[in-house]
Amino acid sequence: MKKRGPLLAAFCIPLLITLIICVNREIYPFGDQCMLHIDMYHQYCPFFTELMEKLKTGGSTFYSWNIGLGADFVSLYAYYLASPLNWLLILWPRGYVIEFMTALSILKIALSGLTFTYYLGEHFLVWQDAGNAAA
């Protein structure tokens, strides 16, 4: 019970800060700007698009002719796309990969706050100390 408050705050605070930045910088859906720049736009976005197509159409996951002059998709997946959160692409409509990547970046920032707070609590036994102090 005592874990929920800090964990919820550790998720919500980075989420709110990131959303405030998106509003301030007019990043979609709060404006017409995009969070993707340079490599994220020119490299990751085509990789995510190809992953979406493979997940939705059942295409071969071993090789892709749609990336450059063709590429080994297994190594590309292992290096760039292996996050389990990327599988949320299945739920996203085609044509909105950039918007998905923006939402995914915001979610990952919030989850990093949550998981790091959980790690600190377990590693330094903060949860146990809070329980002993109450007893």
Task: Report the location of each language-model feature.
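Membrane-interface coil-to-helix junctions
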Residues: 17-116
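Membrane-embedded helix bundles of polyisoprenyl
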Residues: 14-18, 109-122, 127-135
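Membrane-interface starts of transmembrane alpha-helices
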Residues: 5-9, 93-104, 126-134
